[in-house]
Amino acid sequence: DRIHQAGAYAGVQFGLGTPMSPQTQVNDYTNEEIKAIVKDCGAAARRLKEPGFDCVEMKGATTDVLNQFLSRSRNFREDEYGAQNNENRVRLFKEIIEEIRTQCGPDFTILTLINAVEECDSALGDNEGYIVLEEAKYLAQQLEQAGADLIQVRVGTPGQEISCWAPDCNHTGIHMDGATGFGTQFNYASHFGGAQDGRHSGAGAFIPLAREIKQVVSLPVGCAGYMDPRT
């Protein structure tokens, strides 16, 4: 209520999984556990709606468990949630959105956060299985079909989460706190498919990604990153 009194909306971001886990965790879930996760997400959203929260955001970015289901580099399942095709990869994400919509109704806002493009920062050039922009476009279309109301995009770097939302940190040197493996001379044209705009800092660097995603969906599309008033 205090948030609403100040003229703002109240929401919570959902991330899947147990405390920090090996990146193979996605392959260890049983189908029964996956179905329970779907139900739990819907129930958690309903419990937030009841006291007055306006929205939830499902985080399918960085290297969270939900993102691992989307990634061919980490998802080695051989069932309907495996990475054999795009439909299977996005299945869990869609089921969660649909369950939240079922439990919370049409007047509850569901936001989503995805990696629009990924790159391996620990072994530069070895990007086999990482999400590319065309895959993210398909993902965005499927999230809209499932009932999402908004899509937020950023880049994904499995080695260090900080550069996913603070792209300026791509410039920091390796072995420094919060640094990535890209080194101190970061050439935006040579990384992430050239999709970031090096003229801007913070969320502004992701505007080209949002523009590409917006071309294939009717939903609002935003950039997830820190705000820099200079850009």
Please describe what each predicted stretch is.
Residues D1-T231:
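Flavin-dependent oxidoreductase catalytic cores
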